[in-house]
Amino acid sequence: MRLKPHEAQSYRKKALWVSWISIVVTLILAVAGFTVSFMRHSASAFGFAFDATLDVLSSIIVLWRYSNAAAVHSAHREYIACVILGVIFILSSLCILGKAIHDLATKLLPEVDDFLFSVSIVSGLMCVILAVAKFMLGRILTSRALITDGFNSMVGGIMGFSILISAEVFRHYPNVWYLDGTIGILIGLVIQAYGVKLLVDMIPRVRQTRNYERFE
């Protein structure tokens, strides 16, 4: 069901607000994640930090998508946003996979402490809250770009909690040191698969809409 003009503009503004909040929050989480990754040698923390950086970029793309009030229903703008997101997903997944494989190959052991736990819990909760808000707005505005941004936040939430799980397992079972790197690889593969699917779905649609919709 298509929204009335005033409803569409109201939800467009909410999408902009959520995107701005997401940019600020995930930027802070990215810095915290990279700090934990380098200080505690955690591949899953690096994966989370990279995903948080990706979340910042995807929220910026959503900002661009809804920055023009007249283009709130623009299919062409929507599809371009999704193609850009797909490319970013694939590039970031390669970095996450590279770091995780390197850590497994060199048998880099993660260091576990309270700082790691606190960062992972806060990160996981914040990302899940952002994901729910983006999914809700994405469904109302029927926006694949917003839903994709929400998916990215949800992955960030899962990764935040995965840091906690792998660290706790390593604390009690040091012989399962490879869990951290394995989770990093799995997350990298999920992000890569979603990025490829976005490109396969959206590139043909960008070409189709280019001819009959004026680019805003």
UniProtKB/Swiss-Prot annotation:
It catalyses: Zn(2+)(in) = Zn(2+)(out). The chain crosses the membrane at residues 16-36, 44-64, 78-98, 115-135, 145-165, 183-203. It is a multi-pass membrane protein. Its main location: membrane. GO terms for molecular function: zinc ion binding. Keywords: Cell membrane, Cytoplasmic vesicle, Endosome, Lysosome, Membrane, Synapse, Transmembrane, Transmembrane helix, Transport, Zinc. InterPro entries: Cation_efflux_TMD_sf, Tmem163. Residues 37-43, 99-114, 166-182 are extracellular. Disruption phenotype: Morpholino tmem163a knockdown severely affects central nervous system development. Morphant larvae display locomotor disability, decreased survival, and myelin deficits associated with a reduced number of oligodendrocytes. One of its GO terms (biological process) is myelination. One of its GO terms (cellular component) is lysosomal membrane. It is found in: Cytoplasmic vesicle, Secretory vesicle, Synaptic vesicle membrane; Early endosome membrane; Late endosome membrane; Lysosome membrane. It comes from the Eukaryota. Residues 1-15, 65-77, 136-144, 204-216 are cytoplasmic. PANTHER family: TRANSMEMBRANE PROTEIN 163 (PTHR31937:SF2). Belongs to the TMEM163 family. Zinc ion transporter that mediates zinc efflux and plays a crucial role in intracellular zinc homeostasis. Binds the divalent cations Zn(2+), Ni(2+), and to a minor extent Cu(2+). Is a functional modulator of P2X purinoceptors, including P2RX1, P2RX3, P2RX4 and P2RX7. Plays a role in central nervous system development and is required for myelination, and survival and proliferation of oligodendrocytes. This is Transmembrane protein 163a.
